[in-house]
From Swiss-Prot:
Pathway as given in its UniProt record: Cofactor biosynthesis; coenzyme A biosynthesis; CoA from (R)-pantothenate: step 4/5
Binding of ATP, residues: 9-10, 17, 88-90, 98, 123-129
One MF annotation (Gene Ontology) recorded for this entry: ATP binding
TM regions (residue ranges): none
Broad class of enzyme this protein falls into: transferase
Keyword terms: ATP-binding, Coenzyme A biosynthesis, Cytoplasm, Magnesium, Nucleotide-binding, Nucleotidyltransferase, Transferase
UniProt organism field: Pseudomonas putida (strain ATCC 700007 / DSM 6899 / JCM 31910 / BCRC 17059 / LMG 24140 / F1)
Family under the similarity heading: Belongs to the bacterial CoaD family.
EC identifiers of the protein: 2.7.7.3
Protein name as catalogued: Phosphopantetheine adenylyltransferase
Lineage: Bacteria, Pseudomonadati, Pseudomonadota, Gammaproteobacteria, Pseudomonadales
Disulphide connectivity of cysteines: none
Length: 159
């Protein structure tokens, strides 16, 4: 059984993330969206809410599971029985960092392969950072995130 682990902060999960998960769900037996606590990134949403939003966005995919984690990714992958790390590459500029990460993960978890997918063209420019900035300034984010995520962002920035 191929179990792929798609790690990230998902602050928030975007349509670009959803696109990768949809495609991975057709390629793998089981997809785990691994939502990292990432306290050093000072996320906008708490871990529990990011997990819940990702579950809501992917609930139509029966072979997708969403789990929050705060441990070392290599350890978490072993705990979950994952044999592949999935990473998205939006642009060439993402490659250098992702390549370093893949090599480090290979040292820490040699039995887990890294697989890179590029997003569909219509989502290639979307980033969680840009979505947060647009939402904070009152812009329309409906093209970039699922409605439940848009609602959560709108509510968050009302405060």
């Amino acid at each position: 059984m191929n179990r792929v682990l798609y790690p990230g902060t998902f602050d928030p999960i975007t349509k670009g993330h959803g696109d990768l998960v949809e495609r991975a769900s057709r390629l793998f037996d089981h997809v785990i969206i691994a939502v990292a606590a990432s306290p050093k990134k000072n996320p906008l949403f708490p871990l529990e809410q990011r997990v819940e939003l990702a579950r809501e966005v992917t609930k139509h995919l029966p072979n997708v599971e969403v789990i929050g984690f705060s441990s070392l990714l290599a350890h978490f992958a072993k705990e979950q029985g994952a044999n592949v790390f999935l990473r998205g590459l939006r642009a060439v500029s993402d490659f250098e960092y992702e390549f370093q990460l893949a090599n480090m993960n290979r040292q820490l978890a040699p039995d887990v392969e890294s697989l890179f997918l590029t997003p569909s063209e219509r989502y290639s420019f979307i980033s969680s950072t840009l979505v947060r900035e647009i939402a904070a300034l009152g812009g329309d984010i409906s093209k970039f995130v699922h409605p439940v995520v848009a609602d959560a962002l709108t509510e968050r920035f009302k405060k």
